[in-house]
């Protein structure tokens, strides 16, 4: 799956599966660090994999939600007790060493606040099994994206597990779980005939799943779903039929952006399967009917998730260069809080990697202990130090537990001790082992113009980003160069975008990540220390290959160097500056090279910038403070939740293709990118808060600047109802999402005071349209069990307003035509009045046939004529009504001039369309397919007849041999008859044997005949079925091809018509200009003053005439186009009408053939029998022979006339 290509994705995600050993439970010993008491427990997992739970000796049950579990470790990676007494108590197993039986389950609400469940198994194999199973359950992507129904089942499971020692469910747990409205809970319990006192408890068998559903329906009634149910056909009957349900799913729930061939709409039988799955009433389900209860279950079921499971799976192409991906990246990974006084933690590296991060930062400093061990800390601050070696071990432990794709280690190396740098390099080599990429891959040498390897090429590899030194010069000059480089490296951050000093080598260093701290860091640096760095730096430098940091100079220089293995880091302010000044160049840079963005130094509270800013420019490593779960981090987690949570997301195509340029500040549609229109209607909420408060919902969109809309929509606040508020407000419409592949929708819920409840971030490209539950998550991206929002989403390809009518007409032509007819009727009265006015105003000498031509309609819009309500006067009448002194009147029949330039354009007929090359080619292909099919069946028939002929010959030969033996025996007997002592009864015995033989052979031949007849019938029926099916498919393909050909030809004709219109205008202007010149020539014969006056008037009149004539011509051209478009529609409709006719004819043809077939086969067999019997009787034998000529079964290859001809020049007539 690593190299997944576009197309239909085969889902690889495995559903949750809990092993029997986890369900049955296993004995463990539980211990804590802060106590010397050990507790024997039985640890279990519920069958759905929602919870860990254990009972101790007092039969008290404790739960651990598996969605909170981050990791499961055993053996040397598990926590070990430090107290010797505790260790002695735990060493109770008799199979395996204690270290190998240790299990640590790491859990917590976020990456910082984590806890440990420490266990000891009695056997090593048990420890390994439980560790693997628990980690698998905790990291299951389908479990992290459960359906609404699964979350409600999880709440039910929790109630069933938290029972009293007597096995009863305490009602206080139900009140605690649904605490928003105690009165409602009480009423709902009473509706289920259950006790309602908080101090009561109920037997588990009384609180079945069915009772739980009834309880929920009473607690949280859903009138909005009843309305939807009624809207789709359940108005008079309490159910939807299978056809109505199919329409609902295909019209409302299906994504219109999907290809209908690759992702066809659901068929009736598929919908029936869904009905049988969700309808609780079996009798209704068998009839293909679904009740409102079943409908509600479907809406909350796994098939109706708001995001397709395929998007959660690893579904993107992972074989492109590393620079073509967004890479989940962390800044100052070791910190657990602020930048100045926060604690550093080795565990943060584990948690960050387990969460899907693929790029971590190591801020390395010189250790000041006697052991001279390098440390990781935030220099010149109050943050604590942690061991560099322990960090490397933690990275090695968790690097590939959740993703197999490469890890990038971003070293910020401040260690000025050669010895300690040598230790750092040694630790990397020894601890990472083969996972550390020491040398570049053979296919991707470190050369100019060579792209970076892909994530698939680098699977299970660790890459180091550290300063790379050049070693080409001598030792003396090398020291000088290193000194210069060190000076450059630790200069002020503004130097990052200035040209490098002449002393800097080709492999210059990047500006350090924390340039804002450089002033204070620089005081600890001096030339001698930097000069002594050479050998130690080489130790670390040898680890660097594909990620070589260099100081950024300019996009032009980077493009000229064209070295993909060089990368630069930008503090957010400088990155923003580059994005503002050179957005297109920044995107181009990121196509070939990597860039890393990190937060500015003034973010001492570890807040984050919005990563979307830099994703828009194609920056790969947009590093954030993972310890701070602000909105920026939430968007980051939403981004990397998809594509298998691999930590890599393929950039949009325009950010990868070298032949395309992309401006992230574009406001219009980008050629080649299909924009989307997204509409979100917030309908209702369920169990939004555990308090009786008002709630509201906000909707945001993040993406390109043109797509981003913060707080685009906010519902009204529900009045004291957090259980089932219903809003039913007008939807928020994001009319044009220019780059949907990089846009995400955020739906957030707040209490009336503004307190955050939960949210969900959804990629626009992954959103499924229709009615869906959006199960909310908290600010740490942990799923909330009960809170959900019910929405209706519409998502489709964006259509500009100018083409909206065209799309409407194409998608629903019948409704559109009816609407046009309705409008025409409404305007009919006014139109008739206008026509009468025009007739009255027409010239007296005008013929009746000419008058109506003056009444005009507006130009056709989308191929449908809209009759105007007010018809302006024709140009000729306008000129007559206001004659100017000395002006030349336009001719009465203005149409003559216009008609003289108009060209007749006829729509191509169906017969002409059939002559098109692509259509003829398809017909020839179909002819060949039919010919091959008939040949195959002809061969089968021939083989069958040969087989029967062989059998007949065997029967005949056997018959002749046995008859000859009997006759020979008869002759011997006749000789014996002549002897006097011989008895006379032998003659009668021979005759009886011969008669029996004839009867036996006749029966065999009859059986053979019957068998042949049946087999020939079956074979011919098989042929007819194949022919019929193939012809039916051919009809579909030919109709589709003819429709495509018609559309293509008609579009070409309309394009050509535009050219013709332009030519006609030029021709009209030319003719009118010629007339003007003639009038000017006539005026020259008059005196000069009169001539000048007339000339001026003629020019003024000419301008008016040209304007009017051009207007009339455009109207005439518009009418012509309308007629042509209408004719095009008629032809396309005629083509579509052909399909049912041809299908009916085909059905009739083969019905007749099937009816005649048994008689034809019978006649053939009988005729063959008669011919062979007469032939054999001439040779003294009676048996039937079977003809070996298949042509007698009317099974010859069809002639070219039958299949439509085989002459290339001839038009094929079958099926069209």
UniProtKB/Swiss-Prot annotation:
Residues 507-518 have a biased composition (Acidic residues). Catalyzes the hydrolysis of 1-phosphatidylinositol 4,5-bisphosphate into diacylglycerol (DAG) and inositol 1,4,5-trisphosphate (IP3) and mediates intracellular signaling downstream of G protein-coupled receptors. Regulates the function of the endothelial barrier. Residues 540-656 form the PI-PLC Y-box domain. Residues 656-786 form the C2 domain. This is 1-phosphatidylinositol 4,5-bisphosphate phosphodiesterase beta-1. Its cofactor is Ca(2+). It catalyses: a 1,2-diacyl-sn-glycero-3-phospho-(1D-myo-inositol-4,5-bisphosphate) + H2O = 1D-myo-inositol 1,4,5-trisphosphate + a 1,2-diacyl-sn-glycerol + H(+); a 1,2-diacyl-sn-glycero-3-phospho-(1D-myo-inositol) + H2O = 1D-myo-inositol 1-phosphate + a 1,2-diacyl-sn-glycerol + H(+). Residues 855-871 have a biased composition (Polar residues). InterPro entries: C2_dom, C2_domain_sf, EF-hand-dom_pair, PI-PLC_fam, PLC-beta, PLC-beta1_EF, PLC-beta_C, PLC-beta_C_sf. It is found in: Nucleus membrane; Cytoplasm. A lipid is attached at residue 17 (S-palmitoyl cysteine).
């Amino acid at each position: 799956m690593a190299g997944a290509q576009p197309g239909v994705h085969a889902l690889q995600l495995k559903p949750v599966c809990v092993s029997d050993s986890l369900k049955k439970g296993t004995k463990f010993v539980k211990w804590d660090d802060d106590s010397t008491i050990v507790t024997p427990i039985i640890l279990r997992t519920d069958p759905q994999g929602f919870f860990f739970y254990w009972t101790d000796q007092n039969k008290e049950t404790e739960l651990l939600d598996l969605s909170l579990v981050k990791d499961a470790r055993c053996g040397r990676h598990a926590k070990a007790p430090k107290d010797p007494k505790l260790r002695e108590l735990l060493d109770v197993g008799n199979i395996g060493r204690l270290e190998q039986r240790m299990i640590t389950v790491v859990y917590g609400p976020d990456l910082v606040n984590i806890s440990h469940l420490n266990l000891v198994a009695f056997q090593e194999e048990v420890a390994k099994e439980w560790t693997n199973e628990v980690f698998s359950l905790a990291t299951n992507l389908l479990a992290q994206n459960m359906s609404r129904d699964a979350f409600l089942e999880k709440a039910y499971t929790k109630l069933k597990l938290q029972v009293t020692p007597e096995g009863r469910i305490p009602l206080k747990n139900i009140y605690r779980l649904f605490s928003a409205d105690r009165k409602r809970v009480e009423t709902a319990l009473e509706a289920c005939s259950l006790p309602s006192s908080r101090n009561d408890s109920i037997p588990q068998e009384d609180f079945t799943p069915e009772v739980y559903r009834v309880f929920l329906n009473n607690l949280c009634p859903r009138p909005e779903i009843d309305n939807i149910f009624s809207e789709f056909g359940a108005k008079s009957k309490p159910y939807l039929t299978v056809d109505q349900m199919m329409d609902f799913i295909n019209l409302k729930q299906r994504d219109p952006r999907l290809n209908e061939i690759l992702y066809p709409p659901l068929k009736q039988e598929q919908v029936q399967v869904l009905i049988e799955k969700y309808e609780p009433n079996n009798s209704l389900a068998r009839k293909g009917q679904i009740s409102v209860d079943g409908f509600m279950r479907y809406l909350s079921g796994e098939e109706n998730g708001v995001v397709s499971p395929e998007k959660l799976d690893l579904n993107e192409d992972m074989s492109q260069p590393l620079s073509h991906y967004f890479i989940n990246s962390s800044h100052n990974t070791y910190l657990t809080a602020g930048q100045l006084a926060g604690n550093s933690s080795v565990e943060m590296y584990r948690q960050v990697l387990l969460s899907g991060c693929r790029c971590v930062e190591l801020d390395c400093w010189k250790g000041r202990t006697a052991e001279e061990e390098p440390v990781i800390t935030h220099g010149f601050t109050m943050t604590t130090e942690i061991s560099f070696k322990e960090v490397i071990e933690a990275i090695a432990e968790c690097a590939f537990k959740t993703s197999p794709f490469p890890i990038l280690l971003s070293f910020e190396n401040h260690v000025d001790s050669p010895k300690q740098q040598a230790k750092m390099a040694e630790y990397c080599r020894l601890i990472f082992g083969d996972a550390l990429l020491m040398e570049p891959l053979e296919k991707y040498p470190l050369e100019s113009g060579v792209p970076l390897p892909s994530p698939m090429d680098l699977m299970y590899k660790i890459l180091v980003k550290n300063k790379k030194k050049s070693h080409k010069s001598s030792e003396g000059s090398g020291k000088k160069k290193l000194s210069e480089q060190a000076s450059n490296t630790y200069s002020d951050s503004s130097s990052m975008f200035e040209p490098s000093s002449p002393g800097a080598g080709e492999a210059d260093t990047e500006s350090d990540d924390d340039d804002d701290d450089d002033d204070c860091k620089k005081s600890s640096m001096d030339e001698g220390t930097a000069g002594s760095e050479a050998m130690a730096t080489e130790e670390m430098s040898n680890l660097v290959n594909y990620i070589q940091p260099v100081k950024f100079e300019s996009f032009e220089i980077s493009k000229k160097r064209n070295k993909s293995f060089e990368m630069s880091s930008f503090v957010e302010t400088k990155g923003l500056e580059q994005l503002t000044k050179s957005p297109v160049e920044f995107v181009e840079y990121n196509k070939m090279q990597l860039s890393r963005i990190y937060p500015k130094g003034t973010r001492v509270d570890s807040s984050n910038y919005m990563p979307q800013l830099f994703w828009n420019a194609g920056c790969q490593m947009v590093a954030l403070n993972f310890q701070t779960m602000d909105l920026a981090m939430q968007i980051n987690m939403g981004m990397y939740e998809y594509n298998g949570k691999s930590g890599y997301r393929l950039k949009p195509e325009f950010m990868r293709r070298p032949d395309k340029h992309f401006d992230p500040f574009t406001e219009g549609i980008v050629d080649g990118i299909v924009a989307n229109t997204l509409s979100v209607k917030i309908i209702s909420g369920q169990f939004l808060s555990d308090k009786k408060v008002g709630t509201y919902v906000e909707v945001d969109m993040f993406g390109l600047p043109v797509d981003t809309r913060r707080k685009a929509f906010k519902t009204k606040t529900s009045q004291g109802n957090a259980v089932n508020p219903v809003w039913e407000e007008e939807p928020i419409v994001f009319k044009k999402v220019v780059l949907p592949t990089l846009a995400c929708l955020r739906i957030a819920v707040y209490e009336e005071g503004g307190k955050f409840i939960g949210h969900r971030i959804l990629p626009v490209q992954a959103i499924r349209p229709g009615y869906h539950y959006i199960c909310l998550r908290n600010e740490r991206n942990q799923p909330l069990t009960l809170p959900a929002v019910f929405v209706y989403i519409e998502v489709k390809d964006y259509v500009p307003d100018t083409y909206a009518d065209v799309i409407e007409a194409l998608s629903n032509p019948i409704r559109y035509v009816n609407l046009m007819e309705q409008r025409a009727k409404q305007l009919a009265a006014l139109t008739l009045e206008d026509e009468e006015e025009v007739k009255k105003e027409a010239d007296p000498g005008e013929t009746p046939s000419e008058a109506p031509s003056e009444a005009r309609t507006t130009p056709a819009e989308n191929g449908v004529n809209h009759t105007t309500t007010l018809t302006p006067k024709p140009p000729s009448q306008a000129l007559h009504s206001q004659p100017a002194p000395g002006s030349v009147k336009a001719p009465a029949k203005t149409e003559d001039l216009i008609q003289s330039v108009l060209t007749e354009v006829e729509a191509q007929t169906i017969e002409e369309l059939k002559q098109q090359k692509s259509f003829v080619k398809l017909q020839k292909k179909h002819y060949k397919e039919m010919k091959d099919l008939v040949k195959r069946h002809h061969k089968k028939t021939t083989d069958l007849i040969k087989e029967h002929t062989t059998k007949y010959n065997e029967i005949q030969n056997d018959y002749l041999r046995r008859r000859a033996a009997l006759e020979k025996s008869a002759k011997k007997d006749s000789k014996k008859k002549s002897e006097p002592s011989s008895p006379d009864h032998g003659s009668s015995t021979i005759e009886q044997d011969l008669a029996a033989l004839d009867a036996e052979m006749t029966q065999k031949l009859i059986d053979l005949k019957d068998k042949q007849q049946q087999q020939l019938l079956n074979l011919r029926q098989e042929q007819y079925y194949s022919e019929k099916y193939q012809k039916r498919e051919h009809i579909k393909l030919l109709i589709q091809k003819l429709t495509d050909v018609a559309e293509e030809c008609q579009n070409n004709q309309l394009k050509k018509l535009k050219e013709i219109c332009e030519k006609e205008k030029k021709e009209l202007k030319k003719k009118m200009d010629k007339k003007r010149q003639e009038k000017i020539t006539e005026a020259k014969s008059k005196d000069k003053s009169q001539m000048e006056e007339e000339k001026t008037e003629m020019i003024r009149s000419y301008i008016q005439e040209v304007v009017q004539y051009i207007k009339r011509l455009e109207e005439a051209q518009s009418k012509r186009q309308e007629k042509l478009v209408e004719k095009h529609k008629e032809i396309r409709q005629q083509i579509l009408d052909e399909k049912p006719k041809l299908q009916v004819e085909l059905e009739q043809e083969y019905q007749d053939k099937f009816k005649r077939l048994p008689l034809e086969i019978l006649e053939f067999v009988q005729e063959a029998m008669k011919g062979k019997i007469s032939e054999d009787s001439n040779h003294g034998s009676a048996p039937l022979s079977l003809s070996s000529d298949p042509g007698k079964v009317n099974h010859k290859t069809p002639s070219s006339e039958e299949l439509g001809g085989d002459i290339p020049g001839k038009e094929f007539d079958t099926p069209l």
